[in-house]
Amino acid sequence: MKAKELATQPRRVSNLFNDFTVGDAIAKMSKCHYQMIPVLERNSNRYLYSLSNGDILRHIISMGDLDKALKDSISSISMERLVLSCNEEMEVDDLFDIAINQNYIPLVDKSGVFKGILTRRSVMTYLNQGSKE
């Protein structure tokens, strides 16, 4: 099965745009209850990276000034870990190693445009069903 067949579509996934402020990111992440969220390039919807609430917290602490930190662009935040993405044409069977180390896998097309996510649960459920056949 291709990754795109199992993916949660982009319209059902909350995301940030690279021109958001830290305050914007906190508001959006608290509203959707995400601990990590995809960041896209505005206008092109290209996937850039994923930002965690821990990354944001470390940024605020390192700034030492909450008001100033909330106005910073999210692009100024250092990320603790890289979240690997995959091409929408990849076979789900090939994603086990990525899925066990990430809560989700961002899905992109050949141009890097965000096409949704594969959750760890959806990949593991699919692979588990295949092993029972």
Q: Would you name each region that the model predicts?
A:
Residues 63-71:
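Short, charge-rich, low-complexity interaction segments located
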Residues 1-13, 70-82:
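Bateman (tandem CBS) regulatory domains
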